[in-house]
């Protein structure tokens, strides 16, 4: 199992249409000059989801140049704590290099400045302004919800602060830093 593109071998053999990989794996393949499209039949592959960390602009370009030109690339951002995505891909919108396309279903996601004001095209805090379907309601053994409130609601009153820096673009896409 020392092959850099082993996961693409599995995707090819299984005729995968949806393939999830990490941004770090994409970066590693790029750095090692691996070209999966040359060695694997990825004709069935329609969507690649990238997660784990922000996908760089170079990572976007690598996917389209070396994996598959006509794939839908969906970088996503969320967390295990919410069992969901705050922002993710959307098959009905164009993919813009370096951007995550859309807010997740049921997610009132925004970017705030230090004062708690909504900002655009400026790096700020990724927040969710309203409760969402998979929002945890407490931490185990957290008397009075002190740790829970401190983790997510201390900075902005009654607004979930996820602890990630982000920017909303002119395309209404998101860049996660």
Question: PLM features: what roles do these ranges have?
Answer:
Residues 16-21, 30-95:
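Gly/Ser/Thr-rich phosphate-binding loop
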Residues 118-119, 127-177:
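Conserved ATP-binding/catalytic segment of the ANL
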Residues 110-111, 167:
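Hydrophobic beta-strand positions
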Residues 24-27, 134:
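Alpha-helix/helix-capping structural signal
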């Amino acid at each position: 199992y020392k092959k850099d593109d082993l996961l693409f071998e599995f995707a090819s053999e299984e005729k995968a249409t949806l393939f999830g990989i990490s941004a770090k794996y994409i970066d590693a393949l790029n750095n090692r000059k691996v070209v999966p499209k040359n060695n694997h039949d990825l004709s069935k592959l329609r969507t690649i989801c990238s997660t784990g960390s922000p996908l760089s602009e170079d990572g976007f370009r690598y996917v389209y140049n070396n994996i598959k030109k006509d794939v839908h690339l969906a970088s996503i951002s969320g967390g295990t704590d919410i069992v969901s995505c705050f922002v993710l891909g959307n098959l009905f919108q164009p993919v813009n290099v370096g951007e995550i396309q859309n807010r997740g279903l049921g997610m009132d996601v925004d970017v705030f400045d230090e004062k708690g004001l909504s900002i655009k095209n400026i790096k700020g805090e990724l927040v969710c302004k309203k409760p969402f379907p998979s929002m945890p309601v407490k931490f185990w053994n957290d008397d009075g919800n002190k740790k829970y409130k401190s983790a997510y609601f201390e900075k902005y009153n009654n607004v979930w602060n996820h602890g990630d820096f982000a920017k909303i673009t002119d395309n209404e896409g998101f860049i996660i830093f």
